[in-house]
Amino acid sequence: CGKTSLAEAMLYLSGKIDRRGKIADGNTVCDFDPEEQKRGISISASLAHVEWKETKINVLDTPGYPGFTGEVSQAVRVADSAIIVVDARSGIQVGTELAWDAATAYGVPKVFFVNKCDDNEANFDRVFKELDYKFGRTVCPVFVPVEQGKDITMLDLIAMKAYKYDSRGKRWEIPMEDRFNEVAAQYKDALNEALAGTSDELMEKYFAGEEISREEAAIALHEGIIAGSITPVYCGSATKMWGVYALMDAIAESFPRPTARKTETDPAGKAVAIEPDGADTA
């Protein structure tokens, strides 16, 4: 569904590599094993890292096939958050549920990235409804497409900004149009309900019909992700590198830091205090 391509896009856009590899060419950073290159799939978990907004982001790329669930569990156990990549055409698959269950078992905050929104058969709205139905009201739309396919526009529902993308993944802001606001309105209720669940103050504002400010929304998103009460949904195209800037911004600004995890469970099932050292990472 695009995990390796997403990792490759992050490496390229952050400047970590100057040439973006492709799975079909067998030259991606994360699929370095000859067997992976031959089959065109990930077999084992691999580690890469990028620097973004003064934050070191460690990226653990895991296999998507159900037969390699052990690799997923091992990676999630040491991760601070889990980005679950979902195909905008086919929606929830077995691997989606396995990744969700693994992250839940280890108490790791979860984020969805709906990939392949550049495909003409993409249906973000259907996939979002599937996620909402399957995984509950913690699912929170943050970055959504207005159009899908080759001519795509994406909306940041927190900042209420619209973006276009070029062939190299670069984005630029465009004016908000009435039709963009109409699309945003379709997801705003789900967004505000999830944000309101992070504090009594926001819940009171929500039930009173008052607008949640952008500043309040940004803080609530950060706190909700850490607490596990919000599972944000982003979207884009890993191969086109669309939406990847927004995801990296979120990782650097809203995702939990290693210091957020205070304890770990040892083999005997006993909680052990942990004290992460070193530079700020995500």
Regions inferred by a protein language model and the residue ranges of each:
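Structural and coupling elements of P-loop NTPases
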Residues: 1-282
